[in-house]
From Swiss-Prot:
Changing residue 47 to A/E/M: Loss of catalytic activity. This is DNA endonuclease I-CreI. Keywords: Chloroplast, Endonuclease, Hydrolase, Intron homing, Magnesium, Metal-binding, Nuclease, Plastid. It comes from Chlamydomonas reinhardtii (Chlamydomonas smithii). Coiled coil: none annotated. Residues 26-38, 44-47, 68-70, 138-143 are annotated as: Interaction with DNA.
């Protein structure tokens, strides 16, 4: 789906996202993946649940994503890679506070195919995730590019010691 959004909508949404939105990249441990980690990329807008109607309207207007409730707040979530790339490509020029995060997420998405094949490229992409976390003032992060580096080094050592 390559929806083209109108400029007025993108301008409004960029201001809204700069205030109440998040552009998130995470490294999650996952033993079933080649490098024992997966990357998670998310565009999120949070509102009090009493204003969930606004988030439901975003789902309709953006055409992808979903709304989840977390107690007194609700979140609009977009994490499907192709629609996320399409959406952020159009939104990015209008962002002010979150433009660096959008640029880094777009860069990550564009490098995903090679990052899935090369441990060095995967590690490089993980450093971009670290940069996004720093821009977002992330407080609860457990897995960083250094965590991934240690796992990749361990995997490399196992390969070397195997006959």
């Amino acid at each position: 789906m390559n929806t083209k959004y109108n400029k007025e909508f993108l301008l409004y949404l960029a201001g809204f996202v700069d205030g109440d939105g998040s552009i998130i990249a995470q490294i999650k441990p996952n033993q079933s993946y080649k490098f024992k980690h997966q990357l998670s990329l998310t565009f999120q807008v949070t509102q009090k649940t009493q204003r969930r109607w606004f988030l439901d309207k975003l789902v309709d207007e953006i055409g992808v994503g979903y709304v989840r409730d977390r107690g007194s707040v609700s979140d609009y979530i977009l994490s499907e890679i192709k629609p996320l790339h399409n959406f952020l490509t159009q939104l990015q020029p209008f962002l002010k506070l979150k433009q660096k995060q959008a640029n880094l997420v777009l860069k990550i998405i564009e490098q995903l195919p090679s990052a899935k094949e090369s441990p060095d490229k995967f590690l490089e992409v993980c450093t971009w995730v670290d940069q996004i976390a720093a821009l977002n003032d992330s407080k609860t992060r457990k897995t960083t590019s250094e965590t991934v580096r240690a796992v990749l080094d361990s995997l490399s050592e196992k390969k070397k010691s195997s006959p």
